């Protein structure tokens, strides 16, 4: 039986809640890896916690800046030995992505650099409001070309775009956020699919799950996920 890769979003600044999420998502059927974003990383003790964290984790910083600043941001996490994935914004451009990938090879070769395309909280209307004239599919495909060209290891996109990306760029690690178990609320997400749709139908390499796993009873939610997939 295939062991699917799930990144669980530890979207909190409370270390005790993080410990509970990690403890309660532990199981033998799925590979569940904690994902830490801006809220935890910027919190008072978040970074210190990650310095001492003994297991592999995903650092979701979505870096987006000039090449030099972005490169030094990677250099500054050299001490986070168990970081295995980090996100950067494709909007930062080809030179920034190249600089980050180059620095990552020096800092920690084990880190996979993932390029974030259009956030799953956005839709075509949202993009139009910010001045974009192309639709989501067109933008993501354009960004995918740059991500591949930059040497980055993977791409973050919704399941809708992932179908095309998987066919066109087979070597890219495809990660899909915007995942909800059947019946769960969309909350602030716009482009949402179920774990089954993403992992089984679209065959993405991994998914990100937040509230569908971490809200209310975590252990029960993990079992719901297992029953849903298998």
Language model regions located:
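Hydrophobic faces of well-ordered beta-strands that scaffold small-molecule active sites
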Residues: 4-10, 32-36, 57-61, 84-88, ...
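Conserved alpha/beta-domain cores
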Residues: 10-53, 61, 67-70, 159, ...
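Generic structural signal for well-ordered alpha-helices
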Residues: 19-23, 47-50, 74, 94-101, ...
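Active-site-proximal loop/turn and secondary-structure-junction residues that shape catalytic pockets
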Residues: 12-14, 38-42, 63-65, 90-94, ...
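A C-terminal functional module that forms or caps the active site or interfaces directly
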Residues: 36, 40, 44, 157-206
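Glycine-rich phosphate-binding active-site loops on the catalytic face of alpha/beta enzymes
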Residues: 84-93, 181, 191-221
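Acidic (Asp/Glu)-rich catalytic clusters
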Residues: 22-29, 47-54, 76-80, 101-108, ...
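Conserved anion-binding
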Residues: 2-3, 69-154, 158-162, 166, ...
């Amino acid at each position: 039986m295939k062991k699917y890769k799930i990144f669980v979003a530890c979207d909190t600044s409370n270390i005790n809640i993080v410990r509970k999420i990690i403890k309660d998502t532990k199981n033998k059927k799925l590979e569940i890896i904690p994902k830490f974003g801006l809220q935890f990383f910027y919190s008072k003790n978040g970074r210190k916690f990650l310095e001492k964290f003994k297991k592999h984790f995903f650092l979701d910083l979505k870096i987006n800046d000039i090449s030099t600043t972005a490169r030094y941001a990677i250099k500054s996490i050299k001490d986070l030995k168990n970081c295995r994935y980090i996100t950067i914004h494709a909007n930062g451009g080809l030179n920034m992505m190249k600089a980050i990938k180059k620095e990552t090879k020096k800092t920690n070769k084990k880190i996979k650099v993932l390029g974030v395309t259009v956030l799953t909280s956005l839709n075509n209307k949202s993009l139009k409001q910010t001045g974009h004239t192309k639709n989501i599919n067109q933008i993501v495909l354009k960004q995918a070309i740059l991500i591949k060209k930059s040497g980055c290891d993977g791409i973050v996109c919704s399941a809708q775009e992932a179908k095309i990306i998987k066919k066109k760029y087979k070597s890219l690690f495809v990660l899909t956020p915007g995942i909800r178990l059947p019946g769960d609320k969309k909350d602030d997400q716009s482009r949402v699919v179920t774990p089954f749709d993403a992992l089984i139908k679209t065959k993405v390499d991994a998914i990100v799950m937040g509230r569908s796993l971490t809200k209310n009873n975590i252990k029960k939610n993990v079992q719901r996920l297992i029953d849903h997939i298998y």
